[in-house]
């Protein structure tokens, strides 16, 4: 609800009403943005609550991305994108069964194909919100590999956006350090 005060008789009542209405629309817009942010936070928090390793991984990847951005002298805008995308890169895993995230057993080809969809799901989630649309493409491409063996598009070399390559490197480094890699059943 908007509100304004008519502070003197010389002020037109309709101007006061117009200001109150404008304040109301601003409040609604800001509230909508807050709800959108809360939605993303709720999704990632749900994923992290169900799998604490994913939370640790997100934090580590974000930190590694920030460090690499500083070393590479990236702009403040690219650094923020990289940190945000680094933290949210696996948000698409929210649709996976928790046991697939545990990585302590061999998985079937069918399960592997389900896991490989997480960048697409993450892209769809982040592309739905104005405040994350600029990182959606990075999340989509974070599993691409320089030699073209990645997924979902099989991009290779410089077809992969630089920031997505940095996320892939940070993620791979963290996974190797934490020895959380799932083993695909051959």
Region spans (language model):
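Charge-dense, low-complexity intrinsically disordered segments
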Residues: 7, 14, 30, 52-55, ...
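Catalytic core regions of nucleotide second-messenger enzymes
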Residues: 1, 32-34, 131, 159
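A short glycine-enriched loop-to-beta-strand structural element that forms part of the catalytic core
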Residues: 1-21
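HAMP domain helices
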Residues: 20, 32-43
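Histidine- and acidic-residue-rich, metal-dependent catalytic cores
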Residues: 39-186
